[in-house]
């Protein structure tokens, strides 16, 4: 029986690649050895070259073929730089001019890659992540030795200039934002000290529960003038100050005075945590813990009248032994229980009983500026705080219990209606 034989296949001809392709593959292989990111940058430069060539051909026509109706002609090349891999990379930019030579014709691909806004944003993000200008280049992705040799834009001074430009834009955008479309139910105002200066910042809570950084102002202290200027600026930018609004503050008299000067119907909620600290700081440690427990129990009481009665009783108990603590407890006592009188449910009250939300935003600003060793001037303080507020906004979530905010709006309107005569009543 004859054995089955496999058919003999003809020899496959050796694939011979053009020299141009072989050189390109060798360059890509070299970049691949330096890492995938370096390969991506090398590929990006190659793709950019093809895009530029395609733009030129679309405007001028194929090289060597005369087009009588063409409106532009090739005009050689010129050294230029594009943004790739967090750097400014040198490439040769083809030039195209009108047939009469009077004007340069822009190439869409070049217009897309040439701007430096991306580098400004990268500098802002990395600096706010506490990467110093000295270590900036070490934090960039690898782009390959060949690209690195000619790349620019990573020096300490260049990064610093870009960061300043980016933070100036962040400050300008924050202070110029249109607020007319915001439907605020609550507002928080607090101060932050940076070096020898004080910045007052404002955070709004909208009807749908979003937290919105509103603005900031700089001064020597947290005084009524600085706060009033900040709030008046919000009003000038379109914020409605005629509707009732819950304003949460830490109890500083300057804040309260400025709020009542600018807003027509503010309903003040003093931060319960600040009140607790102010009282217990005036007590010996053995007594402070007991007083703190009684204050927390009263603050969380379902009945605001009973809560106020308990706190007034506690103040009387402290009158003889610790009069300073008793006076601190009585000062603005009713305003620490505002959310209870408004019937705010516990889930939403957790957010509105204190200034924790705005203090968390301030803490993020401080964290981002941790590497700053020398504050040159007030403008530098404003730039850093504004940039930090912008970064904090990216981390914001809707407040707990936001579904109860429409009910809070109704309660605020009802509260004001009971103390403010209507136009019809005044006429009568």
Model-derived segments and spans:
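RNase H-like nuclease fold core
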Residues: 2-4, 65, 72-77, 82-99, ...
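Metal-dependent DNA phosphodiester-chemistry modules and their immediately adjacent helices/loops
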Residues: 91, 279-309, 313-316
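Short, conserved catalytic/metal-binding motifs centered on acidic residues
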Residues: 52, 136, 186-192, 211, ...
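Inter-helix linker motif
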Residues: 264-281
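Short, conserved DNA-binding cores of transcription-related domains
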Residues: 2-110
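Short, amphipathic alpha-helical "recognition" segments used to contact nucleic acids or chromatin
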Residues: 118-130
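Acidic/histidine-rich catalytic cores and adjacent linkers
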Residues: 1-12, 19-31, 43, 49, ...
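Short, charged amphipathic recognition helices of the HTH superfamily
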Residues: 129-142
